[in-house]
């Protein structure tokens, strides 16, 4: 029994070390979390555009139902409209439909969908379904692992629900949004993997863009980030996104830091 337990720990550690560079900070990879596992996240986002500083807190639960299907449930709380309050929530699901594995490399493709609700009025054409807008989104993710380097691209389309009862006169009423991203992650440490207790240190660089089809307005953000993974179960993310180019005004995510802690529990779902 003890030998089986040790083997399970080694497998978990190998999983975290091999795929750690795919755990992007601002986007999701096509790969899924381990089967029958639960993850708990707490994320804090701080924005410097208001002109005052505002922040959002996102508690999140993730469920790995199988190697191909996982789901996230999020709640959004912020002080963007005065006092700190609950803004809404979101359900996100991802289905991996393609896997191609080779030694030290693999390719994954997945489809995702999201439905969100938010109490907030809109101040911008940008559609952000993680706190700012009610709506739905769908898209595709493609991820390529090449030893210590992981590359991923995402293409999505979002539709915002009508919120005329909360709309402020003269402010934009966004309807649809095309989103796209290109993400890279590199495993810096450990240089040589020995056991699952070794910390993993990863660096990321992500390009995050959106286009409003109705107005033609768009933007492209650059988002560097660092990440530490401890004991294959605890993950700490720190990142910052800033605009490289664009003409979409009043965006909340234009200059934003992200700080996240994640805790994973393996083989707990029946």
Report residues per predicted region.
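Transmembrane beta-barrel domains of Gram-negative outer membranes and organellar outer membranes
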Residues: 19-153, 157-163, 171-270
């Amino acid at each position: 029994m003890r030998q089986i337990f040790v083997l399970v720990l080694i497998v978990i550690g190998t999983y975290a070390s091999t795929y750690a560079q795919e755990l992007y900070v601002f986007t999701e990879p096509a790969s899924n979390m381990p089967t029958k596992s639960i993850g708990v996240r707490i994320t804090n986002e701080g924005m410097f555009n208001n002109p005052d500083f505002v922040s959002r807190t996102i508690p999140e639960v993730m469920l790995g139902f199988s190697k191909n299907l996982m789901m996230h449930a999020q709640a959004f709380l912020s002080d963007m409209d005065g006092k700190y309050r609950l803004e809404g929530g979101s359900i996100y699901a991802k289905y991996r439909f393609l896997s191609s594995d080779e030694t030290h490399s693999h390719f994954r493709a997945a489809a995702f969908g999201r439905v969100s609700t938010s109490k907030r009025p809109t101040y911008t054409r940008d559609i952000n379904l993680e706190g700012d807008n009610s709506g739905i989104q769908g898209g595709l993710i493609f991820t390529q692992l090449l030893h210590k380097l992981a590359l991923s691209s995402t293409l999505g389309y979002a539709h915002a629900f009508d919120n005329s009862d909360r709309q402020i006169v003269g402010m934009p009423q966004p309807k649809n949004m095309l989103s796209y991203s290109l993400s890279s992650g590199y495993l810096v440490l450990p240089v040589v993997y020995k056991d699952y207790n070794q910390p993993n240190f990863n660096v990321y660089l992500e390009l995050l863009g959106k286009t409003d089809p109705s107005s033609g307005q768009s933007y492209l953000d650059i988002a560097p980030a660092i990440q530490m993974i401890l004991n294959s179960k605890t993950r700490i993310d720190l990142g910052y996104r800033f605009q490289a180019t664009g003409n979409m005004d009043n965006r909340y995510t234009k200059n934003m830091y992200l700080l996240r802690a994640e805790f994973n529990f393996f083989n707990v779902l029946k």
